[in-house]
C-alpha cells in the first residue's frame, strides 16, 4: 500500500510511503542509510508522493513531477511511457531511480561519490542527504540542512525489515576454472552454458541459495533446481532463478528435495555426454523448469542468464574466468540494514516531528 495523489501528504501518509520505499530498495542492495538520505530529500521535494505535481499544477510538464520532482516532468514521464509504466505508481518511479543508478543518469558527482557508491554507503543518513541534495537534486538554494534532519528522522523511525529472507546467490564452487564458455564451439553453440572443472575429479559444489530440486534427468546426469525465494544476484537484480547442474555420475537427490544454502549439491563428473570430468551450468530467470531447447546446442528453455550476472564470487579463486565480468557483492543474507538505535525512538519521535514542522519541511520545494 502507498499513497499517490496530487496533494501534500500528511505525516502518517508519508510514513506509509517511506516504509514502502525502504522495503522496496533494501532487497535491491541499498543501505538503510542511503534510502533515508534520499527520503530526507523526497520529503522536501514531494512529501514522498509519486503523484504530486510541482505547486499542484497538474499537467504542467515544464515543472516538476513525482517523488524527486523530475524537472521538466517529461524527463520522467516520457521514460515511463516508453517502458509501459504507470506514471504515478510508486514502483514505476523507483524503477526509474534504479535505472538512473545503472545508467549514470541525473547524478553529477559533486561530493566524491558516485550514485552506485551512494546506494551502498554506510555514512550517516544526514550526510547522505546532503550528498543527494548536492549531486542529484541540485536546487538553486543548496543550503537546506533540514533535509539532513528529515533523513535522521526516517532512519530512527522506519523499521528496516525490507530484506528479510533475501539471500545472495553464491557461485556453487570455490574455484572458477572454465573449460568451455558461452557459445562454445564444442557443445555450447548459441547458449549461455559454461563448463567448470574443480581442483580434482568429483569436485564438490554447493547450493548457491535455499532451493528445491524440480527435475531429475538420469540419462543425461543432471538435476534442475529453483530458488525457494527471490535472490540477490551478482548484478544487483533481485529475481527467482532456475538452473541445472549436469554430469554428476551419482545424483544425490530426487525431485522435491530441499537444500539450504551451502549444503552439498553434487560433484563434478563424466555422466551423460561428457568427455571429461566437469560441472556444466546453465541458468534461466524465474522459478519454473521448462525443459530444454536447441539453440542449436541444448540449453534450458526460458530466458537464459549470464552465470556471471547471477552468482557472486565472494571467496572464490578465479583460475580461468575467460575474461567474463565476475562480480563480488557486499550483500549480507537476511540483513535488514537497521543500524539505528531504537531505544529512544518513542521519546524522540514527537521532538523530530516538531523539528520538521518548524523547519518548514512540509511546504515542499
Swiss-Prot record:
Which EC class, in a word? Answer: hydrolase
Cofactor stoichiometry and binding?
A: Binds 1 zinc ion per subunit.
Query: Can you name one GO molecular function term for this protein?
Result: metal ion binding
Query: Keyword set for this entry?
Result: Antimicrobial, Bacteriolytic enzyme, Cell wall biogenesis/degradation, Glycosidase, Hydrolase, Late protein, Metal-binding, Metalloprotease, Multifunctional enzyme, Protease, Virion, Zinc
Q: Name one GO cellular component term.
A: virion component
Question: Which protein is depicted?
Answer: Morphogenesis protein 1
Instruction: Give the record's family classification.
Output: In the N-terminal section; belongs to the glycosyl hydrolase 24 family. In the C-terminal section; belongs to the peptidase M23B family.
What is this protein for, i.e. what is its function? Answer: Essential for tail assembly and the production of infectious particles. Degrades the peptidoglycan layer of the host cell wall and thereby facilitates infection of host bacteria. Acts probably as multifunctional enzyme that degrades N-acetylglucosamine polymers (in vitro) and cleaves the peptide cross-links of the host cell wall.
Q: Where is this region: Linker?
A: 160-165
* SUPFAM superfamilies (UniProt xref): Duplicated hybrid motif
CDD domains assigned to the protein according to its UniProt record, in alphabetical order: M23_peptidase
Question: Active-site residues?
Answer: 45
Region annotated Probable metalloendopeptidase, chain positions:
166-365
Q: Which cofactor does it need?
A: Zn(2+)
Q: Where is this region: Lysozyme-like glycosidase?
A: 1-159
Enzyme Commission code: 3.2.1.-, 3.4.-.-
Which residues are involved in binding substrate? 137-140
Q: Where in the cell is it found?
A: Virion
Q: What is its main location?
A: virion
Task: Please provide the Gene Ontology terms (biological process) for this protein.
Answer: cell wall organization; defense response to bacterium; killing of cells of another organism; proteolysis
At which positions is Zn(2+) bound?
A: 188, 195, 280
Q: Specify whether Cell wall biogenesis/degradation is a keyword of the entry.
A: yes
* Top-level lineage group: Viruses
Q: Does the keyword Cell wall biogenesis/degradation apply?
A: yes
Amino acid at each position: 500500500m502507498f499513497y499517490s495523489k496530487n496533494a501534500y501528504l500528511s505525516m502518517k501518509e508519508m510514513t506509509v510511503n517511506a516504509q514502502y520505499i525502504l522495503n522496496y530498495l533494501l532487497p535491491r542492495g541499498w543501505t538503510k542509510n542511503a534510502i533515508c538520505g534520499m527520503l530526507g530529500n523526497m520529503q522536501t521535494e514531494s512529501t514522498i508522493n509519486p503523484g504530486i505535481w510541482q505547486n499542484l499544477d497538474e499537467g504542467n510538464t515544464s515543472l516538476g513531477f513525482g517523488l524527486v520532482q523530475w524537472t521538466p516532468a517529461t524527463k520522467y514521464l516520457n521514460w515511463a511511457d516508453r517502458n509501459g509504466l504507470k506514471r504515478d505508481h510508486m514502483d514505476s518511479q523507483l524503477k526509474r531511480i534504479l535505472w538512473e543508478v545503472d545508467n549514470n543518469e541525473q547524478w553529477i558527482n559533486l561530493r566524491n561519490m558516485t550514485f552506485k557508491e551512494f546506494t551502498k554507503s554506510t555514512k550517516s543518513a544526514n550526510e547522505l542527504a546532503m550528498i543527494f541534495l548536492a549531486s542529484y537534486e541540485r536546487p538553486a538554494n543548496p543550503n537546506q540542512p533540514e533535509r539532513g534532519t528529515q533523513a535522521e528522522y526516517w532512519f530512527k523511525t522506519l523499521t528496516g525489515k525490507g530484506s528479510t529472507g533475501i539471500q545472495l546467490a553464491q557461485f556453487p564452487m570455490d574455484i572458477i576454472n572454465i573449460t568451455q564458455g558461452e557459445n562454445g564451439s564444442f557443445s555450447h553453440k548459441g547458449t549461455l552454458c559454461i563448463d567448470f572443472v574443480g581442483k580434482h575429479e568429483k569436485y564438490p559444489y554447493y547450493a548457491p541459495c535455499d532451493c528445491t530440486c524440480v527435475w531429475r534427468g538420469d540419462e543425461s546426469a543432471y538435476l534442475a533446481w529453483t530458488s525457494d525465494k527471490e535472490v540477490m544476484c551478482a548484478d544487483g537484480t533481485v529475481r527467482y532463478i532456475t538452473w541445472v547442474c549436469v554430469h554428476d555420475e551419482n545424483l544425490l537427490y530426487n525431485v522435491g528435495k530441499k537444500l539450504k544454502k551451502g549444503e552439498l549439491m553434487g560433484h563434478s563428473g563424466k555422466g551423460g555426454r561428457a568427455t571429461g570430468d566437469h560441472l556444466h551450468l546453465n541458468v534461466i530467470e524465474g522459478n519454473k523448469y521448462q525443459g530444454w531447447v536447441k539453440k542449436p546446442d541444448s540449453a534450458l528453455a526460458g530466458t537464459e542468464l549470464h552465470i556471471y550476472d547471477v552468482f557472486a564470487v565472494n571467496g572464490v579463486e578465479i583460475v580461468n574466468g575467460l575474461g567474463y565480468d565476475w562480480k563480488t557483492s557486499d550483500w549480507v543474507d537476511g540483513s535488514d540494514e537497521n543500524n539505528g538505535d531504537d531505544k529512544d525512538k518513542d521519546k524522540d519521535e514527537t521532538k523530530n516531528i516538531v523539528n520538521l514542522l518548524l523547519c518548514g519541511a512540509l511546504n515542499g520545494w
